[in-house]
């Protein structure tokens, strides 16, 4: 969310322990889906993002769920998000979300989660001085031909 400059963040789906799954917030200014895709590809170093929706639609309130997003579609709709950025969405769930007025951007699990490896690496280095820590950054595990 921070990488996209989202503001006024809140938890997308609250869990029993007071934490939550995903986040929802606002872009600094409304933009087109196409412009948002360009930003996502730039910030996350991606070649592709799968779109369920209209590339010319305007979006401002954005929900993010880096893992599978199918379980938070209803929450995103209830919180009036214009778009859900997720790491995985099924074909039918993407179509169903569109019918509810929600644009879906599937950036893949790797696409949204690879940045976490470097954050966790630095964290573990600080706490596990006697253990060799490494990163196996193998890249996107699939090809779009």
Where are the regions a protein language model picked out?
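Hydrophobic structural segments
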Residues: 1-145
């Amino acid at each position: 969310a921070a990488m996209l400059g989202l503001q006024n963040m809140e938890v997308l789906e609250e869990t029993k322990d007071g934490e939550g799954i995903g986040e929802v917030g606002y872009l600094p200014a409304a933009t087109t889906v196409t412009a948002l895709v360009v930003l996502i590809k730039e910030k996350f170093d991606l070649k592709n993002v799968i779109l369920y929706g209209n590339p010319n639609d305007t979006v401002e309130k954005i929900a993010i769920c880096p893992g599978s997003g199918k379980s938070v579609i209803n929450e995103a709709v209830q919180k009036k998000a214009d778009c859900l950025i997720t790491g995985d969405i099924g074909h039918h769930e993407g179509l169903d979300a569109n019918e509810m007025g929600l644009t879906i951007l599937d950036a893949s699990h790797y696409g949204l989660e690879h940045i976490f490896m470097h954050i966790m690496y630095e964290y573990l280095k600080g706490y596990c001085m006697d253990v060799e820590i490494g990163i196996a950054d193998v890249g996107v595990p699939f090809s779009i031909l």
